[in-house]
Amino acid sequence: MLQNVTPHNKLPGEGNAGLLGLGPEAAAPGKRIRKPSLLYEGFESPTMASVPALQLTPANPPPPEVSNPKKPGRVTNQLQYLHKVVMKALWKHQFAWPFRQPVDAVKLGLPDYHKIIKQPMDMGTIKRRLENNYYWAASECMQDFNTMFTNCYIYNKPTDDIVLMAQTLEKIFLQKVASMPQEEQELVVTIPKNSHKKGAKLAALQGSITSAHQVPAVSSVSHTALYTPPPEIPTTVLNIPHPSVISSPLLKSLHSAGPPLLAVSAAPPAQPLAKKKGVKRKADTTTPTPTAILAPGSPASPPGGLEPKAARLPPVRRESGRPIKPPRKDLPDSQQQHQSSKKGKLSEQLKHCNGILKELLSKKHAAYAWPFYKPVDASALGLHDYHDIIKHPMDLSTVKRKMENRDYRDAQEFAADVRLMFSNCYKYNPPDHDVVAMARKLQDVFEFRYAKMPDEPLEPGPLPVSTALPPGLAKSSSESSSEESSSESSSEEEEEEDEDEEEEEEESESSDSEEERAHRLAELQEQLRAVHEQLAALSQGPISKPKRKREKKEKKKKRKAEKHRGRAGADEDDKGPRAPRPSQPKKSKKAGGGGSSGAATLGPPGFGPSGGGATKLPKKATKTAPPALPAGYDSEEEEESRPMSYDEKRQLSLDINKLPGEKLGRVVHIIQAREPSLRDSNPEEIEIDFETLKPSTLRELERYVLSCLRKKPRKPYTIKKPVGKTKEELALEKKRELEKRLQDVSGQLNSTKKPPKKASEKTETSSAQQVAVSRLSASSSSSDSSSSSSSSSSSDTSDSDSG
């Protein structure tokens, strides 16, 4: 001690000078004590060092206050936005780390920092102030942010890295603030019920709350919870050295309560909240600093009625006055998917729409989709004119609810609602607004997915043939459709059916009956009536464009019919009454099997009066049948109006892409000629959307593309035209053929001798009748033709003469 005191007594002035000479080292008295300088060993006394050190470079000043019971604070929509959106974005940024805590001038060796910067500020302080409801208005918080950035620019050189980092953060700050609600409104905050179960510090609080009259002090927690005195609601006072109950009339006095209350960082004591009876404590779950709950009913509370801190709210981006569950968007969505399956199946297109909706609500797009999750809360956001401008609000939660309730009949209704939501956004907000950019981004996602909408699968229905066929349709539609699919398959079917007829020859000839005879006669008369109808329709109605393939088939059928007729004539000469029957079914089967038309004219059994069995009538029926098919199916208008399946459209798109450049002009011409809405569009930049094109346009495009690519058509409606015959000639030919058949049918009615035998058992349906008739006649014709091959040519000529 003497060594230390002696130099002090001898050289007080030198001691001071020596300390000044230490420079920056002297700024930290602790350092000097631990590492004394050898040069100034005589002046290193603790008493001398302590006084000048405090004068020259004081230690870091206390950090800015984060709570002040004398200063009222509150929760507003703008402050909540600054806390949940702005602060969250800045805090996570890679350049945020220098700004997360106050500047430590001693540690960083910046002795002049606090001389230049009179009001230090950092993001950690701002964050804690937001959590503690320190601010009364958002402008105060924004002022703190600006102070933080300005301090950085004032103290550092413009070229320093820290300045560039601050500029980056400030730019993000200004972008986020641009999306902040324009009008500030105070929020009523509700507290989650189970919040007291979470958090380490809150566990200590739970043990400390006993009753309204027993309030232990908790020294480890620096926040104060204040309650009103009703006995069922406990009152907790933290950091107060004696248990006490603070009633509402005394709340104002707490502002000047002295040192014990200086550390209070909860919501100011005068913040009333809706009274919750029987709830003993509410604790914060989102921040490490628990706040207290102030019960209502305090007449002395400051105006505006403030709530506990905003950190109590779950992290949501849209402000609302009602309790909000944590926004786990995908889980409820998947659960509702299971529920929706019970309500009825969605169509393929609506399933696709549901998938789009799930994607829009997924976390992948949450960064720019969150403003559209819930309906716009105009009152909370301070948008008083919103509902004056937007007459039909829409949001994704409403779309989702409508989808679950099966309110959408088709994909167009779904798309209309989603687009309405985006158009509302564009209508209300200025074009340079952040939310407009978010809407455009989300709409791009929607439109991209919606463009991949699958076609609804066409329900298998009856072919158009059935519309023009007489009521006694006997041939199964499967036979007719298979025939039309390819000419080769039709000829194979004819051969197979002929074989079947021959196999059943003996069985069919074995038993004749009066009943069968009556059935047969009814069939023939029905055929006759059908022939009359077809003849009248052909002569009166407009000539429909015949299809090439069907005309080719007709020619084939005619030639076969002539052969069969010749064969039948020979049979008549040899076998008498039985010969016509074989020839007729064979013809009906050949013509009907190939064109599925012989069946079309058969009527139900027992339709007409009994009479002579008609031997050649089926032959006539077979001849009359082929025109029946063109009458129903040949109309190009009907064919063109047939909608395309998804696969056909996809194939057409691929084929159009294969076309050479010079052929695309014709494609554009076809589209513009048939689509009035596209006539004015620029041919250079026309955009083809197959969903909007008419079926007739698509069919015309398909024909053109196939002709360009020289592909064999997939469908039977594109068939080569017979060379050298006009439409009129073909129609006249048909007419003559029908007249000839009519004469043959009437001749058969007059000269029927013996009816077929077992057809009654096979006439449950009209198609069964036809099969039976054709098989009976075919079998007998085959057997007879073998014995009368020599006379077939003569019978053929006589047949043609009678025609």
UniProtKB/Swiss-Prot annotation:
Annotated Gene3D superfamilies: 1.20.1270.220, Bromodomain-like
PROSITE patterns: BROMODOMAIN_1, BROMODOMAIN_2, NET
SUPFAM superfamilies assigned: Bromodomain (SSF47370)
Keywords annotated in UniProt: Acetylation, Bromodomain, Chromatin regulator, Chromosome, Nucleus, Phosphoprotein, Repeat, Transcription, Transcription regulation
An example Gene Ontology biological process: chromatin looping
UniProt-annotated location(s): Nucleus; Chromosome
SMART domains from the UniProt entry: BROMO (SM00297)
Sequence motif: Nuclear localization signal, positions: 556-560
PANTHER family reported in the protein's UniProt record: BROMODOMAIN-CONTAINING PROTEIN 2 (PTHR22880:SF240), FALZ-RELATED BROMODOMAIN-CONTAINING PROTEINS (PTHR22880)
Protein name per Swiss-Prot or TrEMBL: Bromodomain-containing protein 2
